[in-house]
Amino acid sequence: MKNLKNKTFIITGGGRGIGAEASKLIASKGANVILTCRTENQGLSVEKEILNNGYCAKFIPQDVTIENDWRNVIEEGLATYGRIDGVVNNAGSFSWKSMNDSKLEDFREVIDVNLTGSFLGLKYGTEAIRKHGKGGSIVMISSVLGKVGASNTTAVCAAKGGVRLLAKAGACELGPEKIRVNSIHPGLTDTEIGKAFTQGLNEDEFVQSNIPLGRKANSGEIAKTILFLVSDESFFMTGAELTVDGGLTAR
């Protein structure tokens, strides 16, 4: 894979899990990484690790649901690196509750972080990419729950399904400008969110019964898929949805 030297990518939810692994991997390929999250100590820790390894990173605190935070991230990113080449809309919020147990504020939180945050990332990321006029790549992190339903996932399915189609709409609209928009749909992954999903279940039994490859994904495997989509290796891909679930949705 060609390196990403002199390119700059914004990665939301970059303080832990998939976002942290993607930040480290993309930086290791020569890119400037702007990683954002709400938890400052997590973001600074990832930034420090990247810098200590001799790569380029800048942490900016951000709530992806706040429009002014997006303006600030773009402004600081352009001031620091001079250009933006892509955005990875990874920040997420999840609620594993039945409809009866869900409150409206629970539903809104999941929709706001996952769907509204992704919309704002698409909107402001596109504006920044346009400034250099050479196209770019926006990656939406959806979920297998953006493609199929499951019990106690009402808000998550609604939000992640919206992210999936937001990516397709963005691909249609932005293709003429060589701005590509694709979505990734992870299955069960070794993150805090993944652990919460299987809480109360026999995880080993769930995995063996539902995932043909017989294990969960690790965050690094999802990060490699993100790297592929932000790189020129995927230059003719837009509007695509890459499912990385070990065969969970193949049954």
Predicted region positions:
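Residue(s) in the substrate-gating loop at a strand-loop-helix junction
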Residues: 143
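Alpha-helical segment proximal to the catalytic Tyr-Lys
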Residues: 127, 172-176, 235
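Short, small/polar-rich loop/turn modules that mediate ligand/substrate recognition or access, typified
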Residues: 88, 175, 180, 237-239
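Active-site helix of classical SDR
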Residues: 122, 159, 167
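Conserved glycine-rich cofactor-binding loop
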Residues: 15-17, 39
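Substrate-binding pocket helix/loop in short-chain dehydrogenase/reductase
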Residues: 98-99, 106-111, 207
